[in-house]
């Protein structure tokens, strides 16, 4: 003999009960169920199927009536019929006996469904009590009348275990705003007060006096309010700020091969909570339409309603519909944009908005420097609840709008704009193989960003090629250092300092040829060049060196300052003092031979080019240990000087003459002259001895065009 499982929900209790009746499912009646429960003061509502509305809760009072069965089980809701327990939205009539029986909203089926798209049964305005015209919670422009319940007109309710007022929405025709009463994480608050109306945050759309009078009336008529569950209360201000519109989109599937959406099912302890749009694939019908966005709730596909349907059933039905020919009609409840592109300039039409985590994280990262935007000065930025944009107390030197990007812009400028927090490129922490990749972005997003923000690309293929060049140049890097670009991979920004060889402090005037553009040789190890600290002028220690036979007689230089450009006099500073003394004039007279060597910088372009080629050939033949310091020597004829005077050392220091005393940075193995102090790192040298650390860093970041010759300011 078969048995029937009956799952029933009792009043406001969250956990349902299960009883087994020793009767086959096709023969079980209400009387059989009552015999097991023995609860005389309850009304019984059963899950059943209605031809017009689909799944409903039907009240059955006849003991001989057979109970509707779904998947071999009966689902029932037991509601107290004593008339003393009603929720905050129910209306107390003048006669207590006229109070309609409260209906329990319980979970387990279709939980998290906003109630405004659960149409109730058809009713007439004539049955309304006068007090329902200005309900204390429902706004005036969305009037939801009450009516007396009759068994033959079953109510279609669903929710999270609470007693709810009846309202006639007339199907989907007039109710387009979804109340967010079951969004568990945002819109609930607890209250243990006896006055149930105080559980509602009332909007200002009604007269406060009428609400107050009605509150006192209910307080007199209600001896005790039942304990309301957490999910039974909602804030009407949440409804006003998170107004979700229901839209219907008809897609023509003849033009597209696939629908192009992924769906996500939400579940909690009380059952499945709806089907949501997870992501939208490019090239599909949904992406081409553009109205459906990730985060929207899928309510209906064609004529199939997804309410009260489990996630598995909804997925199965959706697959069946997609495989059928013909247009597809999707009904969705719109959600706010989960990842706005212009999150910093998004107009705020309402004073209170839900917090956008994406905007929050990106702004916080920008302010704390998690992924710094090169070229921007620090700015104190604040976002207020009513502000429509970011206000800066310190003006930024380069905002994203200031970048005029084209295919002729250098890559550094484009990467600067791409790294800007306002660029629109989605840069955030990603998970890959359970590894967190900080500040990563997807290759396809880079291609799209380049195509839409950089002028000059004829098609997306060229933008993809440009992104590949960014990868090869090191401006973006693959997480595992792959050299081939793929739109499906995660990338991070490369170190811009590693590509500073293309930059200089000053612009070139174009008068020099390409042979003047030398690249920066490798810098020596920090310990390879000790800094003398006996004098305030900085210059390398002398080092014996035999020049290449093809070189002219070398001279000396005590230069100090940033090397800068060959054509910029202002960026060079000579170690000599213009205020000549008699002793210096005598020194100039003695060093007549070296003057000609010092003025060798006026040699023509051809001579300097050939000298560099000879030097490069000779350096390729020496060991690497010698190359590290030979590549940084100072040759007077390699510096184009616009001055007629000559560089001399600081006062009191005799100049070095001849090839054996060539100015060279000493390698690590060379010990300083007797009595010299030990070498120290630049960071530990006092500011008065290092002249200008900032100028030094600028010189390090901007290589000169003269084979690595640096002057320190």
UniProtKB/Swiss-Prot annotation:
Keywords, sorted A to Z: Cilium biogenesis/degradation, Cytoplasm, Developmental protein, Wnt signaling pathway
Example of a GO MF term: beta-catenin binding
InterPro entries: DEP_dom, Dishevelled_C-dom, Dishevelled_fam, Dishevelled_protein_dom, DIX, DIX_dom_sf, Dsh/Dvl-rel, PDZ
Biased composition (Low complexity): 173-189, 564-579
Renumbered residue ranges of the record's region Disordered: 87-235, 508-527, 545-652
Compositional bias ranges of the Basic and acidic residues kind: 140-155, 580-593, 602-618
Listed SMART domains: DAX, DEP, PDZ
Polar residues: bias regions: 87-98, 118-127, 199-210, 508-518
Ranges of residues in domain PDZ: 248-333
Stretches with biased composition (Basic residues): 212-225, 629-646
Cellular component aspect of the GO annotation: cytoplasm
Subcellular location: Cytoplasm
Keyword Cytoplasm: yes
GO biological process: ciliary basal body organization; cilium assembly; intracellular signal transduction; Wnt signaling pathway
SUPFAM superfamilies named among the record's database cross-references: PDZ domain-like (SSF50156), Ubiquitin-like (SSF54236), Winged helix' DNA-binding domain (SSF46785)
Chief site of localization: cytoplasm
Sequence ranges assigned to domain DIX in this UniProt record: 1-82
Alphabetized Pfam families for the sequence: DEP, Dishevelled, DIX, Dsh_C, PDZ
Stated role: Involved in the signal transduction pathway mediated by multiple Wnt genes. Required during ciliogenesis for the docking of basal bodies to the apical plasma membrane.
Database matches in PANTHER family: SEGMENT POLARITY PROTEIN DISHEVELLED, SEGMENT POLARITY PROTEIN DISHEVELLED HOMOLOG DVL-3
Protein name: Segment polarity protein dishevelled homolog DVL-3
Name of the encoding gene: dvl3
């Amino acid at each position: 003999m078969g048995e029937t499982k009956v799952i029933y929900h009792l009043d406001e209790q969250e956990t349902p009960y299960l009883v087994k009746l020793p009767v086959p499912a096709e023969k079980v009646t209400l009387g059989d169920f009552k015999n097991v429960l023995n609860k005389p003061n309850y009304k019984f509502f059963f899950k059943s199927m209605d031809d017009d509305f689909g799944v409903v809760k039907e009240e059955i009072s006849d003991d001989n009536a057979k109970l509707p069965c779904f998947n071999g089980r009966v689902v029932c809701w037991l509601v107290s019929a004593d008339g003393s327990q009603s929720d905050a939205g129910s209306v107390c009539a003048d006669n207590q006996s006229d109070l309609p029986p409260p209906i329990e909203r319980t979970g387990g089926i279709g939980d998290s469904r906003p109630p405004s798209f659960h149409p109730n049964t058809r009713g007439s305005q004539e049955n309304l009590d006068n007090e329902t015209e200005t309900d204390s919670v429902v706004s005036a422009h969305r009037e939801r009348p009450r009516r007396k319940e009759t068994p033959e007109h079953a109510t279609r309710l669903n929710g999270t275990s609470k007693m709810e007022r009846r309202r006639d929405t007339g199907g989907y025709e007039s109710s387009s705003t979804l109340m967010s009463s079951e969004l568990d994480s945002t819109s609930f608050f607890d209250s243990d007060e006896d006055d149930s109306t105080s559980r509602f945050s009332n909007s200002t759309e009604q007269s406060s006096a009428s609400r107050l009078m009605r509150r006192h009336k209910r307080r007199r008529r209600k001896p005790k309010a039942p304990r309301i569950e957490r999910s039974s209360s909602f804030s009407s201000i949440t409804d006003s700020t998170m107004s979700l519109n229901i839209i219907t989109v008809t897609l023509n599937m003849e033009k597209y091969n696939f629908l192009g959406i992924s769906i996500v099912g939400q579940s909690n302890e009380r059952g499945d909570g709806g089907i949501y749009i997870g992501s939208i694939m490019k090239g599909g019908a949904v992406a081409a339409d553009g109205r459906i966005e990730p985060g929207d709730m899928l309510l209906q596909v064609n004529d199939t309603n997804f309410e009260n349907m489990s996630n598995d059933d909804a997925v199965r039905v959706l697959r069946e519909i997609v495989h059928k020919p013909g247009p597809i009609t999707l009904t969705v409840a719109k959600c706010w944009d989960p990842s706005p592109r212009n999150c910093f300039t998004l107009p705020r039409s309402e004073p209170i908005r839900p917090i956008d985590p994406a905007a929050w994280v990106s702004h916080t990262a920008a302010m704390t420097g998690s992924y710094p935007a090169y070229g921007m000065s620090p700015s104190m930025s604040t976002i207020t609840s009513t502000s429509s944009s970011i206000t800066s107390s310190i003006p930024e030197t380069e905002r994203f709008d200031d970048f005029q990007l084209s295919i002729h812009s250098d890559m550094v400028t484009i990467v600067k704009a791409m790294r800007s927090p306002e660029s629109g490129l989605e840069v955030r922490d990603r998970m890959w193989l359970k590894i967190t990749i900080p500040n990563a972005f997807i290759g396809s997003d880079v291609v799209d960003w380049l195509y839409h923000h950089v002028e000059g690309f004829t098609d997306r293929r060229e933008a993809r090629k440009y992104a590949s060049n960014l990868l090869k140049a090191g401006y973006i890097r693959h997480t595992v250092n792959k050299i081939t670009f793929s739109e499906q991979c995660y990338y991070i920004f490369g170190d811009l300092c590693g590509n500073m060889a293309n930059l200089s402090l000053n612009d070139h005037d174009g008068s020099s040829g390409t042979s003047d553009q030398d690249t920066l040789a490798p810098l020596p190890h920090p310990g390879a060049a000790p800094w003398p600290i006996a004098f305030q002028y900085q210059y390398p220690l002398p080092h014996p060196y035999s020049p290449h036979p093809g070189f002219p007689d070398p001279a000396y230089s005590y230069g100090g300052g940033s090397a800068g450009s060959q054509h910029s006099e202002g960026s060079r500073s000579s170690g000599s003092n213009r205020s000549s003394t008699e002793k210096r004039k005598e020194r100039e007279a003695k060093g007549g031979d070296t003057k000609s060597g010092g003025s060798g910088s006026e040699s023509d372009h051809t001579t300097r080019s050939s000298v560099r080629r000879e030097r490069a050939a000779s350096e390729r033949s020496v060991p690497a240990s010698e190359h590290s310091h030979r590549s940084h020597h100072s040759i007077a004829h390699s510096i184009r000087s616009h001055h007629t005077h000559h560089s001399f050392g600081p006062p009191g220091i005799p100049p070095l003459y001849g090839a054996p005393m060539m100015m060279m940075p000493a390698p690590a193995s060379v010990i300083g002259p007797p009595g010299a102090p030990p070498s120290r790192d630049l960071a530990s040298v006092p500011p008065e001895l290092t002249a200008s650390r900032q100028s030094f860093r600028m010189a390090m970041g901007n290589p000169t065009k003269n084979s690595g010759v640096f002057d320190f300011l």
